[in-house]
Amino acid sequence: MMSRLKRWLAVVSVAFVAGCGSGDDPVNVLETARNNQYTILGEAVTAAGLTATLSGPGPFTVFAPTDAAFAALLAELGITKAQLLADSALLTKVLTYHVVLGEVKKASVPLGTAITTVQGGVLRVDSSAGALVITDERGRTATITSTDIQASNGVIHGIDRVILPRGTVVEMAQANPVFSTLVEALVAADLTSTLSGSGPFTVFAPTNEAFAALLTELGLTKAELLANKPLLTDVLRYHVLSSRVGSSAVPLGLPITPLQAGFFKVSATPSGLVITDGRNRTAKIVTADVNATNGVIHVIDRVILPANLDIVQTAAANPDFSLLVEAVTAADLGAILSQPGPFTVFAPTNAAFVALLTELGTTKEALFANRELLTQVLTYHVVAGNVLKAAVPTGTAVATLAGPTQTLTVSPSLVITDQRGRTANIVATDVLTRNGVIHVIDRVILPN
């Protein structure tokens, strides 16, 4: 790394001399920089402790930001020049990102392809309306405003914006204005330090529009949301995984556990990857695989929320499960099914219970009064664990909470066969709750 820096700084030194247009022997790079459009670049080189390495054969290509470009960077990052110059590690990383090995003149710049820098990151140059435009690793762009400034050991191209290498997930969000509300939220929840750590993390990052929609949905102002630190922390942590998971590695249809308690799932649809959150709301991944130094970002169009209801509460909120809820209450199973679990419940509809009463030739009152039978029947509808549709075992006996011998079988077409040879169709799947998942069935299944 230092050998590359030594050779690069020699190029910068010559660049400043070339900018003076003098035929005299070159003067010190810092003296030249004082009256040159690359003054702040010269200060940055000095502040980074790199001036002693101004030698080396090269050749190199340097993309040199103007003073105006540095001023714009300070405004973008919300820091002063003194703060920037005090951070030698950041300066070294940024400065070496502006250098490419080899002499690449304007006519030879490879367009539309990744160009590796001395820093190790990549940038891309494209032709746009007759100009050459650089796109950095944060998706920011800079225009090449002057080209082919010849130096003894390379060439310099002036640019109108400081380009930045890939940063942490927080830095990547800070560099993109569409995440300004997300950044405010991370600051308010004191999560910036966590997400600036080594990670790795996967962040499902909601846009400003996604946050605006959430405020409308919850009936809150932004100030009220940012002031509610417990809620904000829970919501933000629900968007973060403790590992790097690229879009091609996302486990489709399976429970995904974030930093926050709970889970969500991701499904592949014709329009792309879609998240179903704990409240059964959906968010689309609109941009995937924005790589950061400590993880990866997937941009989403809706803020996802952890579940606020358990299995019993979710069933109680749906009028089509009113008989099921009555049965659970009569069997005194509510406390069990409200525990952390997780549980998978095959939930019969009201119509399924009515059909059972006819089949058994009994009344609801008589069935619900037989607590022992009711408990056996209801626990036969419960399987331990979060078994989403994609993971339902087919063609094999599945143990239930009714007992190790009280098993059921599910076919590939999602038809359950109970121990009496009766069948029930799974008519709706993957209703997520705080402590498990519900699959809706059209018939009450029965154990032996």
Where are these regions (language model features)?
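Bacterial N-terminal signal peptides
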Residues: A10-A18
